């Protein structure tokens, strides 16, 4: 019987398979991006950190202890590097600059520490009996007018001597500003701050001469500098550079006028946090300085008064010659030219209004007058002549020639930084005093209120908050924290490769650490090697300078703020470097500048293409792009590295086969020799086994072999039985193999025999296994069919039983229901028949 097959059409399956294969190929062709770690990228973030100071060692007299304690600063760099950041725009804000606050706190702390070991003048808080000091002669001085009557008081008082229970009467000269009368008789006085402050006398060798201080950032941080010549103090700056230290800033403590500061490069610049708010101070930076020469013509002497055991009070003993008033001289022409430039800027800011300069509206002497330190004495000069003019369209007063002379008064008891409860007594300076300074800026305030005219703006000198003084110098700086670790997507994925030494050969051009900040991420100018090396070398160099300064001045560290800051900067720099290295170690990137990872790049972090990222964006722009996801990426890299370390044991086994060239390594030759000896020994053993088996076989057949190479006739087939010579007949040719000679031939013959033997046995084994598998498969299939039929049978039986059960239940329920209905009907009929039965009963009764 012939079975006719049915031909099926599989064309649609071929088409579907081809389409599916094409889709898979297209999907597999899409490039997958992976996270790559870069170390040494020019990225920074705004930060606040502890700055330390640097100062020129030759800038101060070693015999005098200046109040700024610059002897504890590190030496300035003879070749400071300033690296311009091209194509970089950075926001600056001089009004919210932590450097200003830090400098203010540092200067206050330096004054406090400088005055700690000095004498407290509490014993001088006694009644002073004073009279006005008169000139020694009646002649008039031609240099400058005499001091006002009563400006200097000759006071006598009682103090404790070196023996505590013994009092002694002393006398000294005090300025009128330093004493206040007790009674109305104008003969009893007391020191001005005795009721409110603890007066500390400055130590005899303390100098208040301002010395340039360079503020420096620790390693791992940098100071950005704005070089825009017309920068107004806040907003974006397009000309940015990076420095390690600021320029030398003189901590000049003055009000109204800024002295010995930096000048503007292109015209006068006015800066304010909010020009519309009259409560905000206006800081004016001049283009050309105006020289101010101050003099105290009095030839004073200084005397020492013992006020207790081991304590001395230094006071003015006498004035040699006439008593003349201190004063300052300013060129009237230069000052009016300066005001003219300032008026031009003010009118541009506030509209073409009339600008009026007036004297201070009142307050403490430090604010009402121009206060500053001159040669160790604190001058308070009346600045009314400087601020007493009206300007209409840059047209001011005509009497601009000549010299402007400012009368000055001197105070020895001054409030420190306008702090409550702290006052200082400056010991008098011997001889005459002369000092020359440069006015480089002004502090102005603008009048406000309803009474102010719409056509006039009134400006008055201000000051008092020393933060504005430091702000006038630090306006162009900001501190940033360098973030050398960067992540970006690339096509490279981390793979387990052989461990080998690798040489980093990136560009050798020195651009500085942040020199490539304005370049694109893929630019060749991104020299990661130089930048990474500078991180560590900068730390090492900085620590060497710090340690050198600390070692030289260790006996003074306990008296200065700078020593503590240097130690903080040292620890902070090392911590910053170790933190980055710890992250690299956790990620498996130690010692690498470019480190691939096995973390896939998520498009939700940034869906920009590689070309947009690497050719059009800087590292700073890229960092702002992914800033919200940086911590997540770091976590994923760490988890990926942990997973890789778990698999390291298995991968090490495969690592030996990573390259065939390792097979020829001389360290493996002994292993190869060992394997060769084992193979030869195995072959010899097999030869012996086969020889013994052949001998046993021959002996069983009745032969006596003469040698190991003696061959025996091969057995005939079953269709050709063997015979003997006596039986006659033609002998068949025996199947035999030729004898072999030589070791190699013998080895080859044995190997061939072994291979044939192994092949035949393996083939037989495979055939047997296939037969067994086939048999097991057939039996298994039959068993499955049997169990399937059995299962089907029992399912049918269960189904039938269930149907029968349901039928029986239904029948029983139906029968029970019929019985119940019948009983109910009978009961109903009984009730219905009750009246009939009653009627029948009555009928029977009547009958």
From Swiss-Prot:
Residues 565-583 are annotated as: Immunosuppression. Residues 624-658 form a coiled coil. Highly glycosylated by host. The high number of glycan on the protein is reffered to as 'glycan shield' because it contributes to hide protein sequence from adaptive immune system. Residues 653-674 are annotated as: MPER. The chain crosses the membrane at residues 676-696. Residues 294-327 are annotated as: V3. Residues 360-370 are annotated as: CD4-binding loop. The keyword Coiled coil applies. GO terms for cellular component: host cell endosome membrane; host cell plasma membrane; membrane; viral envelope; virion membrane. A motif (YXXL motif) lies at residues 703-706. Pfam families: GP120 (PF00516), GP41 (PF00517). GO terms for molecular function: structural molecule activity. Residues 32-675 are extracellular. GO terms for biological process: clathrin-dependent endocytosis of virus by host cell; fusion of virus membrane with host endosome membrane; fusion of virus membrane with host plasma membrane; positive regulation of plasma membrane raft polarization; positive regulation of receptor clustering; viral protein processing; virion attachment to host cell. The record marks 502-503 as: Cleavage. A motif (Di-leucine internalization motif) lies at residues 846-847. Inhibitors targeting HIV-1 viral envelope proteins are used as antiretroviral drugs. Attachment of virions to the cell surface via non-specific interactions and CD4 binding can be blocked by inhibitors that include cyanovirin-N, cyclotriazadisulfonamide analogs, PRO 2000, TNX 355 and PRO 542. In addition, BMS 806 can block CD4-induced conformational changes. Env interactions with the coreceptor molecules can be targeted by CCR5 antagonists including SCH-D, maraviroc (UK 427857) and aplaviroc (GW 873140), and the CXCR4 antagonist AMD 070. This is Envelope glycoprotein gp160. It comes from Human immunodeficiency virus type 1 group M subtype B (isolate SF162) (HIV-1).
